[in-house]
């Protein structure tokens, strides 16, 4: 591989991981980014290019960071020159290291991270070494060096380029699908196909489990419902949101493909697991008003799911940057669970138009949204931040948005 010249587009966390991996293999790495600062601070690249410069000659293949669109000019230039384009997922799956031991992967529109982290916790609590990686936070090219079962969260961005078969996964799961990232994929069909591409990564096609009958694979709903009934019988368990219960049962089903983990171990893991923040995170109550941080709800379907668990007196804070979806499909859930909506940010007016049949107040930002919600609230009400939008109009991430909400509520200091 020493003579290969490889372009890496985007030098954020994943891009730097890609560049480091390739440099360690003796590859000549050509780095591309819109930021000169990012180029200057990546020590793994031999040639530096701003993205408005011309595509170089003598390139063997291109690796794009997951967030880099297929419409990026350098990606299009590579395609026009018949140069292979891939993401870190395909790069990892090509390595011999990925066939050495058990590897599981999960994708879907909602619930991926909670399911992945619970699966990792379930394994470790059962004495089975495991490591979560991929879209969950640790880039796959870094995480695959760790011992134990590999548990990979894969996004549609990472599967969009999947054309070849890389049969490395001993188990896989597509949790669900609904409109998301249509601004990136262009349409639902492209988004759906990206998710279905997980099938190309299975060692045995029979070990791909799916939560929607439109996908190719084993429909797992009956199995998951069996485990949900098991949890329902456990009166000692703390109350669980329906979607959390569903995610835990999906993880257990996937774990049992390779490992005989007992139902008792599963129940004990559910009882002791702390799910990640910003996912229907109950912050407490002030003057009888309850607060929930669901900043991770960046899609309409995620907010619909959230509304199933907030009773019928919710004031819902929506808004941010739209990901190509319409908000009118929220109306049935809002009518059951909410008394009003506060719309904020870049697409606030669009939300107000889509929900014109429902009480909506338009504000500029999160601070104003919380003040407005508190003015409307009475004891017993629930104020829930469940935006149904990306955060990038006013924040760097959904985590930053959620941390700011917690700070504004007065439940936690925020470090930005």
Curated annotation (Swiss-Prot):
Q: What residue ranges carry the coiled-coil annotation? A: none
Do you know which Gene3D superfamilies this protein is assigned to?
A: Mur ligase, C-terminal domain, Mur-like, catalytic domain, NAD(P)-binding Rossmann-like Domain
Q: Which GO terms describe its cellular component?
A: cytoplasm
Q: Pfam families from the entry?
A: Mur_ligase_C, Mur_ligase_M, MurD-like_N
- GO terms, biological process: cell division; cell wall organization; peptidoglycan biosynthetic process; regulation of cell shape
Record-annotated residues binding ATP? 108-114
Q: Name one GO molecular function term.
A: ATP binding
Q: So, what pathway does this thing act in?
A: Cell wall biogenesis; peptidoglycan biosynthesis
Q: What is its main location?
A: cytoplasm
Tell me what reaction this enzyme catalyses. Answer: UDP-N-acetyl-alpha-D-muramoyl-L-alanine + D-glutamate + ATP = UDP-N-acetyl-alpha-D-muramoyl-L-alanyl-D-glutamate + ADP + phosphate + H(+)
Tell me its EC number(s), please. Answer: 6.3.2.9
InterPro entries attached here?
Mur-like_cat_sf, Mur_ligase_C, Mur_ligase_C_dom_sf, Mur_ligase_cen, MurD
Q: What does the UniProt keyword field contain?
A: ATP-binding, Cell cycle, Cell division, Cell shape, Cell wall biogenesis/degradation, Cytoplasm, Ligase, Nucleotide-binding, Peptidoglycan synthesis
Instruction: Tell me where in or outside the cell this protein is found.
Output: Cytoplasm
Please give the superkingdom of this protein's source. Bacteria
Q: Indicate whether Transcription regulation appears among the record's keywords.
A: no
Q: What is this protein for, i.e. what is its function?
A: Cell wall formation. Catalyzes the addition of glutamate to the nucleotide precursor UDP-N-acetylmuramoyl-L-alanine (UMA).
Q: Which NCBIfam families match?
A: murD
Q: Which family does it belong to?
A: Belongs to the MurCDEF family.
Spell out the protein name for this chain: UDP-N-acetylmuramoylalanine--D-glutamate ligase
Give the gene that encodes this protein.
murD
